[in-house]
């Protein structure tokens, strides 16, 4: 499976709230960073963050563009998700995936809230 296909499976896991599908795409020592927001290491910490109780139901994640070069995939996309406080997350993202042996070893994500509503 190409690295792009792994990212597509990872995103599909979020759209279905399928933790097993998401975690299967990751190395055991995965690093997830959103600069200025958080830095996590390991599948257990990753799983806790995707179980974030501020949100309700599955998000809707749409990929706009995937670019692959060597062991790196860049994903540009849009995410919407209902929040428990009644709000809506509506944001654009750019995620940088580093791969090792066909799995995501590091994810650096940048998120910008959509103000054009």
What residues fall within each predicted segment?
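A beta-strand edge to alpha-helix "cap/lid" segment located at domain peripheries
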Residues: 2, 15, 33, 47-117
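A short gly/proline-enriched turn/hairpin at secondary-structure junctions
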Residues: 31-40
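Short, low-complexity N-terminal intrinsically disordered segments enriched in polar/charged residues
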Residues: 1-20, 24-28
């Amino acid at each position: 499976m190409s690295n792009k296909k792994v990212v597509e499976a990872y995103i599909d896991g979020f759209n279905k709230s399928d933790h097993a599908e998401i975690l299967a795409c990751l190395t055991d020592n995965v690093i997830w960073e959103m600069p200025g927001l958080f830095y996590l290491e390991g599948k257990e910490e990753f799983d806790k963050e995707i179980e974030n109780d501020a949100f309700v139901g599955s998000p809707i994640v749409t990929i706009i563009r995937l670019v692959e070069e060597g062991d790196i995939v860049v994903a540009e996309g849009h995410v919407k998700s209902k929040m428990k406080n009644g709000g809506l997350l509506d944001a654009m993202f750019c995620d940088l995936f580093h791969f090792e042996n066909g799995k995501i070893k590091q994810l650096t994500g940048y998120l910008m809230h959509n103000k054009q509503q």
